[in-house]
């Protein structure tokens, strides 16, 4: 995506311009205006609509394979948690009032459920600006835990010399 181009208008008074020049300039400005309106409707930034010149918008950050897997795992966990709660509620409703083991087994054996889950109803959904790690999104001052050490390896001994 290219940066918006800067248009430099000549400082020519309208008195010095002929009628044909003014008509040509008007047509050019109308076409530029139309193009800019279409760009704004498509979601593009318009440099002339802001009074302060803005810095160019950086391209979206590429997603690494690890970040992708983390996001998939988080989404799956949230949806599974939501589904588990809904399934439990439906199972409890279907066996409500059952008093014997045979009745319970018969109902559970023939039970068919259909549930719908979505990320809108999932708890702990981060907003777009928050980090992907739960610790980052909940407490910005939290520190990371130390990496686990293998039990088979001996810890390195550090000697401090004066």
Swiss-Prot record:
The keyword DNA-binding applies. GO terms for cellular component: host cell cytoplasm; viral tegument. GO terms for molecular function: DNA binding; identical protein binding. Residues 12-43 form a coiled coil. Keywords: Coiled coil, DNA-binding, Host cytoplasm, Host-virus interaction, Inhibition of host innate immune response by virus, Late protein, Viral immunoevasion, Virion, Virion tegument. InterPro entries: Herpes_BLRF2. GO terms for biological process: symbiont-mediated suppression of host innate immune response. Residues 151-162 have a biased composition (Basic and acidic residues). Residues 118-162 are annotated as: Disordered. It is found in: Virion tegument; Host cytoplasm. Its main location: virion. Homooligomer; homooligomerizes and binds double-stranded DNA (dsDNA) cooperatively. Interacts with host CGAS. Plays a role in the inhibition of host innate immune system by targeting the CGAS enzymatic activity which is the principal cytosolic DNA sensor that detects invading viral DNA. Acts by inhibiting CGAS-DNA phase separation: directly binds double-stranded DNA (dsDNA) in a length dependent but sequence independent manner and is able to form DNA-induced phase separation in infected cells. DNA phase separation of ORF52 mediates disruption of liquid-like droplets in which CGAS is activated, thereby preventing CGAS activity. Belongs to the herpesviridae BLRF2 family. This is Tegument protein BLRF2. It comes from Epstein-Barr virus (strain AG876).
């Amino acid at each position: 995506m290219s940066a918006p181009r800067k248009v430099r208008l000549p400082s020519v008074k309208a008195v010095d311009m002929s009628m044909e020049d003014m008509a040509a300039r008007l047509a050019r400005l109308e076409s530029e205006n139309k193009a800019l309106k279409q760009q704004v409707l498509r979601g593009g930034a318009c440099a002339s609509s802001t009074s302060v010149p803005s810095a160019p918008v950086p391209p979206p950050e590429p997603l690494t394979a690890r970040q992708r897997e983390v996001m998939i795992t988080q989404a799956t966990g949230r949806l599974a948690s939501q589904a588990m709660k809904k399934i439990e509620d439906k199972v409890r409703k279907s066996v409500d009032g059952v008093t014997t083991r045979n009745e319970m087994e018969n109902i559970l054996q023939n039970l068919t459920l259909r549930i719908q889950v979505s990320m809108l109803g999932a708890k702990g959904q981060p907003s777009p600006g928050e980090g992907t790690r739960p610790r980052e999104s909940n407490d910005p001052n939290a520190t990371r835990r130390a990496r686990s050490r293998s039990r088979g390896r001996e810890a390195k001994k550090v000697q401090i010399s004066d």
